[in-house]
């Protein structure tokens, strides 16, 4: 509790904040933070641009991609169901089913 108050008092001191901001480790940490934020922003803009280009492309290619995804998904689902032993879930009727 005392340590918390001491740190709060020190961090609210303009002279200490000024001296810390001039120190090499704090400046380096600020540079790295700014670099990381800028890189994240640029990557986000690039991803948004690629999505816009994809959406603005021919509708036929988007439909083909959706069909390929649907076909691959149904194939994997069927393969997975074939690999299971026993009745499919929900096929039993009556009390005590699927216990």
Swiss-Prot record:
Disordered as annotated region, ranges: 76-99
Q: Which residues form a coiled coil?
A: none
- Kindly list the GO CC terms recorded for this protein: mitochondrion
Q: What else is known?
A: Induced by hypoxia in cancer-associated fibroblasts and promotes tumor angiogenesis by causing increased secretion of VEGFA which leads to endothelial sprouting.
Entry-linked InterPro entries? NCBP2-AS2 (IPR042407)
Gene that encodes the chain: NCBP2AS2
Q: What is this protein called?
A: Protein NCBP2AS2
